[in-house]
């Protein structure tokens, strides 16, 4: 079918590369590019020899001319951005310059400000449209599959959706007193920020971890979950017509929250530079350096994740509730691709999103979120590539 360039070599990229190599009919050749080429080479060494040809390269994703030159040299059908969210705009610039479609899993966030929103990337819509290129935003699980679930529910189950609750439960145990399941810097910035939800056409802001609920998750059990701001709230509020409220909840254990509060209290989660022995350092980046690498958690992690969406709305004039979700087993993920389920649930949809664009099933000029395309081929692919979904027509609701 064609070629894909994957930028990044962390846990999510590792899963995506594994999945591309399982799908050689679509991904005939891939280029893995990262600032640290040795990580790319390690993936190539592990997976080389199959039907998917693998190349590697070193690149600084913030160096737009160098990145553009690399894209032009490889001539991929799509660039799959699995680097840091800070680098999204530079990679989009390079794709425009090289004339290549773009896919990512997380929206842009300025490095010096703990704030993420789609406005910066949506502003590229005219440029991608004029270039005849597709930019697919947020093709992970949340955002990503949660948007596809929403589009599927709207297409097949409802005449109108009024309420969406997105529930992200990680019931895994890695044995550490404190560690993050993906990039510590991004994770801690996300959970220490103020929460918010969309209601009646406006944002309602909350203090960090202010709103707590308890929910009994299938195959995981009862967990405490907390309302956070999450990026798909913004796109779903725009794209799911008639929605009155959208909320996002994520589960956290008491040990995690206790450690996080302690680190916040001593200033270790700050992104403001400080002077230390004549050098400028950012406390959060120092913390990231001493915490366990998320990529190392795979062999230690047991348990399951459960991520999904509870919908409330109308069908044929009657009230209706509907729940779509996926349960993923950490140990099974590690046995298959050498990564835990948090990376797996992001890396698989990343590959599927790239496949949707490469095959033309999802392709139109402009910048789009996943819920703006036909959900059916993506939903079918989830069942094929390791993230089978389940549904309930009588879910327990979140108050």
Residue ranges of predicted features:
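Glycine-rich Rossmann-fold phosphate-binding loop(s) that bind the pyrophosphate
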Residues: 9-10
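N-terminal Rossmann-fold NAD(P) dinucleotide-binding loop
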Residues: 13-14
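Helix N-cap at the beta1-alpha1 junction of Rossmann-like dinucleotide-binding domains, i.e.
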Residues: 36-39
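Rossmann-fold cofactor-recognition segment
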Residues: 49-63
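N-terminal Rossmann-like NAD(P) cofactor-binding module of classical short-chain dehydrogenase/reductase
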Residues: 71, 77-81, 95, 102-103
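Rossmann-fold NAD(P)-binding glycine/threonine-rich loop
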Residues: 106-133
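C-terminal catalytic/substrate-binding lobe primarily of soluble NAD(P)-dependent oxidoreductases
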Residues: 155-399
């Amino acid at each position: 079918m064609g070629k894909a360039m994957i930028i990044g070599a962390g846990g999510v990229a590792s899963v995506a590369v594994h999945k591309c190599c399982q799908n050689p009919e679509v991904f005939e050749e891939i280029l893995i590019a990262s600032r640290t080429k040795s990580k790319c080479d390690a993936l190539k060494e592990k997976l080389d020899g199959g039907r998917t040809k693998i190349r590697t390269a070193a690149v600084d994703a913030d160096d737009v001319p160098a990145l553009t030159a690399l894209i032009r040299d490889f001539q991929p059908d799509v660039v799959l951005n699995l680097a840091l969210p800070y680098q999204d705009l530079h990679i989009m610039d390079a794709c425009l310059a090289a004339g290549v479609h773009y896919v990512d899993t997380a929206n842009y966030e300025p490095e010096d400000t703990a704030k993420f929103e789609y406005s910066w990337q949506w502003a590229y819509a005219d440029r991608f449209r004029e270039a005849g290129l597709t930019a697919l935003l947020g093709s992970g699980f949340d955002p990503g599959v949660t948007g596809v679930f929403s589009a599927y529910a709207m297409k097949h189950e409802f005449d109108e959706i009024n309420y969406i609750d997105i529930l992200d439960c990680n019931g895994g145990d890695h044995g550490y007193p404190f560690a993050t399941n993906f990039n510590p810097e991004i994770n801690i910035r996300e959970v220490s920020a103020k929460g918010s939800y969309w209601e009646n056409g406006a944002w309602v802001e909350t203090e960090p971890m202010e709103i707590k609920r308890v929910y009994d998750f299938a195959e995981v059990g009862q967990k405490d979950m907390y309302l956070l701001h999450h990026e798909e709230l913004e796109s779903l509020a725009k794209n799911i017509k008639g929605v009155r409220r959208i909320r996002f909840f994520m589960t956290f254990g008491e040990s995690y929250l206790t450690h996080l509060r302690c680190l916040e209290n001593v200033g270790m989660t700050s992104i403001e530079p400080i002077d230390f022995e004549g050098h400028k350092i950012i406390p959060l980046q120092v913390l990231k350096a001493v915490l366990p690498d998320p990529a190392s958690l795979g062999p230690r992690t047991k348990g399951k994740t459960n991520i999904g969406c509870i919908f409330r709305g109308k069908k044929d004039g009657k009230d209706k509730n509907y729940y779509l979700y996926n349960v993923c087993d950490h140990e099974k993920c590690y046995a298959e691709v050498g990564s835990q389920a948090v990376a797996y649930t992001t890396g698989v949809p990343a590959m599927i999103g790239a496949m949707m664009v490469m095959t033309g099933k999802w392709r139109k000029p402009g910048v789009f979120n996943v819920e703006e395309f036909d959900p059916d081929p993506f939903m079918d692919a989830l069942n094929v590539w390791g993230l089978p979904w389940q549904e309930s027509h009588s879910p327990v609701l979140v108050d």
